[in-house]
A protein has these predicted regions:
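Conserved NTP-donor binding/palm subdomain of two-metal-ion nucleotidyltransferases/polymerases, i.e.
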Residues: 1-127, 132-373
Length: 373
């Protein structure tokens, strides 16, 4: 019952529902909705739902504890302040790289928040700042070195430069990866053939303009990103909400192409499951030109989302070790229950991390020899 109320609260926030129907949530149910919003990193957006219910149907909010409402209000205000900081840093990054003649685009994060609309964009809980720079790994690391910026550690996909004291930055030189090394070759070729689309959009933030991907690439990327994190640790409803707003923003004339590209990357089952989740949680209407909602796969995906929370951080079914070996063992153990749904990707994930361990050491050796030459 609480899950249904929580979904209804989300629907009030995004404008697909009006109140809770005949139900008047109890104080305990309001507290449970608040806890779930925290777990899913949707506190800010859900507070917009609280405000709508209180404004349009005050009789349904009579059991909302005043102290809880004030804490929720405070959390939403802090989220808005955090978004102001992140927006400013995104514009600063754009200006810095523009001055240095390097093409940079912001994806996920603040550029996705721009899809939420004026009322909700400031209430999306920000994580880090994800940007892509069109120069490759070695040039990106060399750029940071010349700017005297600590790269913060790097891998196959991105570095973590220490540019701001109050915000984490992921500087991507590859947009994303697949854990299946055969699929990874395909996805890198796909990104390579769509580089122009990475820089085709503009996002108007309150403090300035940033470059972002086209709506098409944004939606494809968000699906791929969510699928990858499902395999490597888990996803939450914030990732689903990003996909929801990207679907609303999409050019429907590109739907056939989107379905083909998603199928080519082996993600059709996940996309069909996601459509069921979006219809159940956000009341997304049926879209004949996109995937049919798969209830069986959707139920499995939603169970994973509700059990794990944001990126699986709230999942109590599995351990969360800190050592590399421990993480590898836990990923393998966790992915056993994914085998009947996403076979090749679930099997490939542990081997990807083993491959990456040796790949990085080879790259370090190559960089050392080049500097010595």
């Amino acid at each position: 019952m609480t899950d249904n109320l929580f979904f209804r609260l989300i629907q009030n926030a995004v404008g697909t529902a009006d109140g809770f129907g005949p139900v008047v949530p109890s104080a305990e149910e309001w507290s449970a909705m608040n806890r779930e919003a925290q777990k899913q990193t949707l506190l800010g957006v859900c507070f917009a739902g609280v405000q709508r219910v209180c404004g349009a149907h005050p009789e349904q909010a009579v059991n909302l504890p005043a102290a809880l409402k004030m804490r929720w209000l405070g959390a939403a205000a802090n989220i808005q302040k955090r978004n102001e900081v992140m927006n400013r840093h995104c514009v600063e990054l754009q200006e810095m790289f523009d001055r240095d003649g390097m093409r940079l685009t912001t994806f996920k994060g603040q550029s996705v928040a721009a899809l939420y609309g004026e009322e909700l964009r400031g209430l999306r809980q920000a994580g880090d700042i994800d940007v892509y720079v069109e120069c490759g790994r070695e040039k990106a690391l060399e750029y940071l070195r010349k700017k005297d910026i600590d790269n913060g550690g790097w891998d196959y996909v991105h570095a973590h430069p220490k540019i701001f004291n109050d915000a984490e930055v992921e500087l991507h030189y590859r947009l994303s990866i697949s854990h299946d090394l055969f699929k990874n070759r395909k996805i890198q070729e796909f990104w390579g053939s769509h580089v122009a689309d990475f820089f085709a959009g503009k996002a108007e933030l309150p403090c300035g303009e940033i470059v972002c991907p086209s709506d098409y690439i944004h939606l494809f990327y968000l699906l791929h990103h969510a699928f990858r994190h499902l395999i490597s640790g888990g996803i939450g409803l914030r990732q689903m909400m990003d996909i929801y707003f990207a679907i609303l923003r999409r050019d429907a004339g590109m739907d056939a192409r989107l379905m083909k590209d998603v199928n080519d990357m082996g993600m059709t089952r996940f996309a069909s499951a996601s459509m069921w989740v979006l219809r159940t949680v956000f009341a997304l209407p049926e879209i004949p030109s996109l995937w049919n909602a798969d209830e069986a796969e959707g139920q499995f995906l939603l169970n994973e989302i509700m059990a794990g929370g944001n990126f699986g951080h709230g999942d109590t079914r599995f351990r969360h070790p800190t050592s590399r070996a421990g993480k590898l063992v836990e990923i393998a153990r966790r992915n056993l229950h994914l085998l009947s749904h996403y076979e090749s990707d679930a099997l490939a994930a542990p081997f990807y991390y083993i491959w990456h361990f040796f790949w990085k050491r080879i790259q370090i050796c190559r960089m050392w020899f080049r500097r010595r030459a």
